[in-house]
Amino acid sequence: MKRTIKGLAILLPACALAVAACSDTATSSQSEHARETVSVVLDWTPNTNHSGVYLAMARGYYEQAGIDVEILPYSEAGSASVLLGGGADFAFEGAYSVIAGKARGDDMTMVFNLQQESSQGIAVRADNSDITRPADLDGKLFATWGAAEGVAKVQTMIRNDGGQGNVETALLGTSAYAAVYNGTADYAEGLTTWEGIEADLAGTPVKWFMPADYGVETTPAELGLVTTPAYLRDHSDLAKRFIQSTQRGYKDAISDPSGAVDALLNANPDVAIDRELATRSQELLSSQYWKDSAGSVGHGDVDRWQRYIDYLEGAGLLEDANGKPAFAGLRGADMVTNDLLE
């Protein structure tokens, strides 16, 4: 601090320095004491879906908000299970997981709706001339992640394209493009924003059928950050600081895809992430998928959530805790909120 009274500065230099030193120490101590930890469990190995968090970390946004972020690795149990079991404060999850959990009595709320438009499609070998449209999938083998919603989606696509909707399934244990090239299945579900690019780079290109093009009600949130109502109640201010810092990171990732890729790779030196794959994926996500209907990033569309819930209930795709069909009149407004966003 600059002194304006010369005599005081001459008479009390030692005292002034001592006070300043004490003040700095106290401020530092308070800052360290005030820092709070937030844990986030990933839905898969680190990839471009998570780059906004890593960019927010690299640019000090969490630190400025008094937060230390702990990234927890993907668990075979699933990120929702880790969250509900108290193993994390936030989890990367999609709308289907939140809704299906609610039907079973598991309470989760999406507080950051990362991707409103789905990039999940049905992959077929690009050189497969026997399959040129969804109707051609009838009776053929489908490699799926196992969710009933995925099978119903394909059946709807086939029927809406003039087929019968006969689907044979096999559990997808590898990437979509690998499954259709190694003969595991005739077609598989996957993400155009990652596996589609990966397939091209591997020299095994695939062609895609997108569910929305064939009358399927698609997810209102391919991915987002979820937490529990209890956490929001007990840590409302911390949750808001965390989400707004995260939102800053994803805004930066939209405007600076290369910076997002650098942050992702620098934070995960032990993870084999191909830079070209990450770069092309990030450019696609930043330019086509992350900007929301509000012109920003992170907002959830409650009306779309409700339409998707109504579709899932009407198709019998939700079960209660006893494994019986759930028709509970679930409300999207109970599962997604924009209240923590800037």
Language-model segments: which ranges?
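Short, surface-exposed acidic
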Residues: Q164-E168, D270-Q282, E319-L330
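Short, glycine-/small- and polar/acidic-enriched structural segments
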Residues: Q30-G173, Y177-N182, D186-G190, F209
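Pocket-lining segment of extracytoplasmic ligand-binding domains
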Residues: Y96-S97, S175-A179, G183-D270
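Secondary-structure end/capping motifs
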Residues: D234-A315
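Bacterial lipoprotein signal-peptidase II cleavage site
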Residues: C22-E32
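Bacterial N-terminal signal peptides that target proteins for export
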Residues: M1-I10
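Conserved C-terminal helix/tail region of periplasmic/extracytoplasmic solute-binding proteins
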Residues: W305-E342
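C-terminal motif of bacterial Sec signal peptides marking the signal peptidase cleavage site
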Residues: L17-A21
